[in-house]
From Swiss-Prot:
GO molecular function: acetylgalactosaminyltransferase activity
Subcellular location: Golgi apparatus membrane; Endoplasmic reticulum
One of the GO BP terms on file: protein glycosylation
Annotated gene: B3galnt2
Tissue: Present in testis (at protein level). In testis, it is mainly detected in the middle layers of seminiferous tubules at stages XII to II. Strongly expressed in primary and secondary spermatocytes and early round spermatids, but not in spermatogonia, elongating or elongated spermatids, or in Leydig or Sertoli cells.
Ranges facing Lumenal side: 25-504
Stated family: Belongs to the glycosyltransferase 31 family.
Transmembrane portions of the chain: 4-24
Species for this entry: Mus musculus (Mouse)
Protein name, as recorded: UDP-GalNAc:beta-1,3-N-acetylgalactosaminyltransferase 2
Length: 504
């Protein structure tokens, strides 16, 4: 029996190791909550990784199958067949393990995964934006001569009137007050209402109102209402947290400082309410139809996500070049995707440099390696890219930044491509669960790097815009067809920007 055990043990051990190897190579299930790469390395602490000169991380959205395939058939294919670079570079696409379960039509904006939570909308009637408690003590005559409140429109509305509080101690209206509505970051008011003793408007409940020119404020509009006293006295105002917001069933949201709104220093005057406004909800029939069809739309979307998961699993199994990171794949989560990838590289690979790019970018890896040799780009704590300096912070739109208080970002490299040294990746990976993410991965990197002050190597050949320049290392924002054509021109002439050959 002992002899049989001696013979069987090596076979069992060999089979176990073979199965373990297959398991390591199999693509992760996006819904799997099993062991992470860190857990795997803890089980086998002496496991040896292949060493690479450069790890290339390509940020990619889940549905960008075509862009990934173009890369596999152009610069990645060229790399894999290169006589010297093929063993020196590891390329991985960075994809969120989960898709957003909210259909795009039902999100507050296309860049996040936040549900547009409209229920029982108030239609075909005017709505007072604020309701106030009965106790007069919650209103006070303050020393503040300028008070403001900001809001975001989640479904189109029309503001019909602007209003101000009246002082209960006065007989009639005895003040001179101007009320203005601004679009965020715009210096000129969209419309203005002026209140004075001879022209005080109409009293409704506890406010005096005046009609204003009516504009449809579209979805995603962000504005600020500002009350200004033209007298020496301050305004009668209330703390924002002591009023009830009538949001029309969820068509607008009042933004309070510290709750995702603009930092207080960017608001005009003191945050609060010194009056109100009246509005109506537009396109009510379309809204009701959308709400009625939402359950079916959600069910269809969940089915689509399941199909997408299966396609991604198959793609990963075939190509073995995807890292699924534990985030919901949306634009707002791109910085978190990047931090998760940095952690994966440290836990799962051995390398000297990391190159980050996007799936819509042209990359010339041969030129990158030649440049590294020419410029002697090695050693610790360095960051090589094309840096934007004193870049203004956007407060609205796709690049809206409500978390970073300065008017300009620290220096950051354009996202089309940059290279960082291993020790920087180690620092980012080690602090990945502590680092705050901002609206974009490029500006987030700039803010994170400001803490450690790496040596910056400026190089304009990492292009920031969609242009073609001889010797370029990267260029962004191409369609799959454009990327294929660029690479075909490069293979024909060596320079995609100066090639006169006709591409069939």
């Amino acid at each position: 029996m002992r002899n049989w055990l001696v013979l069987l043990c090596p076979c069992v051990l060999g089979a176990a190791l073979h199965l373990w190897h297959l398991w390591l190579r199999s693509p992760p299930d996006p819904h799997n909550t099993g062991p992470s790469a860190a857990d795997q390395s803890a089980l086998f602490p002496h496991w040896k990784f292949s060493h690479y000169d450069v790890v290339v991380g390509v940020l990619s959205a889940r549905n960008n199958h075509e862009l990934r395939n173009v890369i596999r058939n152009t610069w990645l294919k060229n790399l894999l067949h290169h006589p010297t670079l093929s063993q020196r570079v590891l390329v991985k696409f960075i994809i969120g393990a989960r898709g957003c379960e909210v259909p795009v039509e039902d999100r507050e904006d296309p860049y996040s995964c936040r549900l547009l939570n409209i229920t029982n909308p108030v239609l075909n009637q005017e709505i007072e934006a604020f309701s106030f408690p009965e106790d007069a003590s919650s209103s006070r005559l303050s020393e503040d001569r300028v008070v403001s409140v900001s809001f975001r429109v989640l479904y189109p509305i029309v503001i019909t009137s602007l209003g101000v509080f009246y002082d209960a101690s006065d007989v009639g209206f005895q003040r001179n007050i101007t009320v203005k509505l601004y679009q965020t970051e715009q210096e000129e008011a969209l419309f203005i209402a002026r209140f004075s003793p001879p022209s005080c408007g109409v009293q409704v409940n506890k406010l005096w109102y005046k009609p204003v020119e009516q504009f449809i404020l579209p979805e995603s509009f962000e504005g600020t209402i500002v009350w200004e006293s033209q007298d020496l006295h301050g305004l009668v105002s209330r703390n924002l947290h002591r009023v009830t917001v009538n949001d029309g069933g969820g068509v607008l949201r009042v933004l309070a400082a510290g709750e995702g709104a603009l930092p207080h220093e960017f608001m005009e005057g003191v945050e609060g309410v010194a009056g109100g406004f009246i509005y109506t909800v537009q396109e009510g029939d379309a809204l009701l139809r959308s709400l009625y069809s939402r359950p079916q739309r959600l069910a269809d979307h969940i089915q689509d996500l399941q199909v997408e998961d299966a396609l991604l699993q198959e793609e990963s199994s075939v190509h073995d070049d995807i890292v699924f990171v534990d985030v919901v794949d949306t634009y707002r989560n791109v910085p978190a995707k990047l931090l998760n990838f940095y952690r994966w590289t440290v836990e799962s690979t051995s390398f000297d440099l990391l190159l980050k790019t996007d799936d819509d970018c042209y990359i010339d890896l041969e030129a990158v390696f030649n440049r590294i040799a020419q410029k002697n780009l090695d050693g610790p704590n360095f960051w090589w890219g094309n840096f934007r300096l004193n870049w203004a912070v956007d407060r609205t739109g796709k690049w809206q930044e409500l978390e970073y208080p300065s008017p300009a970002y620290p220096a950051f490299a354009c996202g089309s491509g940059y290279v960082i040294s291993k020790d920087i990746v180690d620092w980012l990976a080690g602090n990945s669960r502590r680092l705050k993410t901002y609206q974009g991965e490029d500006v987030s990197m700039g803010i994170w790097m400001a803490a450690i002050g790496p040596k910056r190597h400026q190089d304009s050949l990492w292009l920031c815009e969609k242009t073609c320049e001889t010797g370029m290392l990267s260029s962004p924002q191409y369609s799959p067809e454009e990327l294929s054509k660029l690479w075909e021109l490069k293979e024909l002439c060596g320079d995609p920007c100066q090639c006169e050959a006709k591409v069939r």
